[in-house]
Amino acid sequence: MKIGILNTDTLKTEFDTKYGQYPAMFSKVLLHAEPKIEIYSYEVQTGEYPVELNECDAYLITGSKVSAYDDLPWIIELKNFIRTLHQHQKKLVGICFGHQLIAEALGGKVERAKEGWNVGIHAATLKKNTILFGSAEQEFNLIYNHQDQVTKIPQESKLLASSRTCPVAMLAIENHILSFQGHIEFDVAYAKDLLQMRRSILGEDKYLKACKTLDAIPQDLKVIDWILNFIKKD
């Protein structure tokens, strides 16, 4: 299986030194789950894309500090690539910004969350008709770190999970697109460092509450297993 990481951000040097860039984070967790995966990385911020769609079996769009509705040339180009992947029914996974950008590209809407930053570990609940992922009402924990959220889903998409703090936590389109607002690639140490970096922005109350949620166990391995099974499924 070949997975192409469409990288949409560059982390600060201090974070890069401790944790690596996003492609390294995703490679670490994906290879832990499935050591035989081949992983390729494309720096779409600078216009690097696969020469052919079939270079990889699936593509994954990372998180980013920018917004899905920003009018940046590379974001517009990536939205067009998403539409091309969708047209060819190529497997595509979106995480955080990737989740939002897929929704924006295919007719949905992304806006600032009225409640502000959603940070820490939170549980999302699966909806009905999610047999591939688990039974209805089953919960799964992921690390969240976002201030934008999907407020309108694409017409052809299916809402698969919601949480109290994130109404659109998981989406799918037919059998080839799957996306999550939460992070599978973050570990708790990185999440803590992000919270510390944004402490003054979050405010002390939200910061402390978010830190307390990090005592819970994120179920990223379960979600990674869902993603890999989704990619393998015809």
Task: Label each region the model flagged.
Residues M1-N80, T84-H88, L208-D234:
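N-terminal beta1-alpha1 cap of cysteine-dependent amidohydrolase-like domains
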Residues K2-T8, S27-V29, S41-E43, Q87, ...:
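Amide-donor transfer/coupling interface in amidating biosynthetic enzymes
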Residues F15-D16, V51, D70-D71, A103-A105, ...:
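Short glycine-/acidic-enriched loop or helix-start segments at secondary-structure transitions
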Residues K18-Q21, N54-C56, P73-I76, G107-V110, ...:
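Short, glycine/charged-enriched secondary-structure capping and boundary segments
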Residues K12, E48, A68, L101, ...:
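Flexible, glycine-rich phosphate/dinucleotide-binding loops
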